[in-house]
Amino acid sequence: MEPFRIHKGTAAVLMNDNIDTDQIIPKQYLKRIERTGFGKYLFDEWRYDNERHENPNFPLNAPDRKGASILITGDNFGCGSSREHAPWALADYGFRVIIAGGFADIFYMNCMKNGMLPIVMDKEMREKLAKTDAREQIEVNLENEVITTSTHRFHFTIEKMWKEKLLNGLDEISITMQYEQEIKEYERMVAVY
């Protein structure tokens, strides 16, 4: 996993509450186990009409929001069924930071396990951040736990364990590999039946 220290990018705004994993990535696209290729289906039923034409009224389709890598959204983001495909779709689309009023627990952990930073922020701060010009680069500094625009600084907090994992680009496998020698020693000591 790539370390996450400072991210600079533009933001897309989708301030709906209770966006569930079915809305993030519909079930019909979950037939693969690769982590890539899901971005084109992100928010599929909102982004496209029945003929697969872009919905011009959907915020991510606005010309000045394309290429955004920060998503500012509502409360309880990622609720519903637990599917890791939802963070995969967000990451494959290009999002590195999701800022919401709150997250479903499993979705929150899956974001971090996939190198994305989910930030919990109150509504007033999100609304101020959402007013940032669509072309402005927003800086998210994980080490200092601060988001900076040309006019505001917003502080956020993150659990120390998750912060260290993201800063160092560590996932479960890379953490396990740090103990490879200890694992081998243990396996030598354990009787084989």
From Swiss-Prot:
Instruction: Give a GO molecular function annotation for the protein.
Output: 3-isopropylmalate dehydratase activity
Superkingdom is: Bacteria
State the GO CC annotations. 3-isopropylmalate dehydratase complex
UniProtKB keywords: Amino-acid biosynthesis, Branched-chain amino acid biosynthesis, Leucine biosynthesis, Lyase
Keyword Amino-acid biosynthesis listed? The answer is yes
Give me any GO biological process, just one.
L-leucine biosynthetic process
**Could you confirm whether the keyword Lyase appears in this record?**
yes
The catalysed reaction is: (2R,3S)-3-isopropylmalate = (2S)-2-isopropylmalate
> Pathway listed for it?
Amino-acid biosynthesis; L-leucine biosynthesis; L-leucine from 3-methyl-2-oxobutanoate: step 2/4
Assigned EC number: 4.2.1.33
* Residues spanning the membrane: none
Q: Which Pfam families match?
A: Aconitase_C
InterPro entries in the record = 3-IsopropMal_deHydase_ssu, Aconitase/3IPM_dehydase_swvl, AconitaseA/IPMdHydase_ssu_swvl, IPMI_Swivel, LeuD
What is the similarity comment for this entry? Belongs to the LeuD family. LeuD type 1 subfamily.
Task: State how it assembles.
Answer: Heterodimer of LeuC and LeuD.
What the protein does comes down to: Catalyzes the isomerization between 2-isopropylmalate and 3-isopropylmalate, via the formation of 2-isopropylmaleate.
In Swiss-Prot or TrEMBL terms, this protein is called: 3-isopropylmalate dehydratase small subunit
Q: Which organism is it from?
A: Bacillus cereus (strain ATCC 10987 / NRS 248)
Which lineage? Bacteria, Bacillati, Bacillota, Bacilli, Bacillales
